[in-house]
Regions:
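Non-catalytic pre-domain segments flanking phosphatase-related domains
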Residues: 1-2, 35
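Metal-dependent phosphodiesterase/phospholipase catalytic core, i.e.
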Residues: 4, 10-11, 58-98
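Structural preference for beta-strand elements that scaffold enzyme active sites
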Residues: 12-14, 41
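Conserved, mostly hydrophobic/aromatic
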Residues: 16, 34, 45, 80
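Short, glycine/acidic-enriched loop or turn micro-motifs at the edges of active sites
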Residues: 19, 46-48, 61-62
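Short, acidic/polar
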Residues: 23-33
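Structural motif
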Residues: 33, 37-39
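Short acidic, Gly/Ser-rich segments with clustered Asp/Glu that frequently serve as metal-coordination loops
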Residues: 42-55
Length: 98
């Protein structure tokens, strides 16, 4: 009997919220930047908007990572799309969408 392991077919490393330290977490910029660093898998958190559309957000409220207030579940996706999810991180990402 052999105990040889089969090669692991899945990514060994997962980028947490994209490249969340280098770009605003859970944004397209964070995922693109993570991909340029060789990541093939990303961990993210999804929430539902008031009108039932999924969007990416870790926190229970909008304040830490956007210019919004309250919870995303109280807003329509159209309202969420207007939020700035980048300015909290750096000027380079000002205006970044969720």
């Amino acid at each position: 009997m052999t105990n040889a392991l089969k090669p692991w077919p899945y990514p060994r490393w997962v980028a947490h919220r994209g490249a969340g330290k280098l770009a605003p977490e859970n944004t397209l910029s964070a995922f693109r930047l993570g991909a340029t660093h060789g990541y093939r898998m990303f961990e993210c958190d999804a929430k539902l908007s008031k009108d039932g559309v999924l969007f990416l957000m870790h926190d229970a409220t909008l304040e830490r990572t956007t210019n919004g207030h309250g919870t995303g579940s109280d807003l329509s996706m159209g309202e969420i799309a207007q939020l700035d999810a980048g300015s909290w991180h750096s000027r380079a990402y000002a205006g970044e969408a969720l």
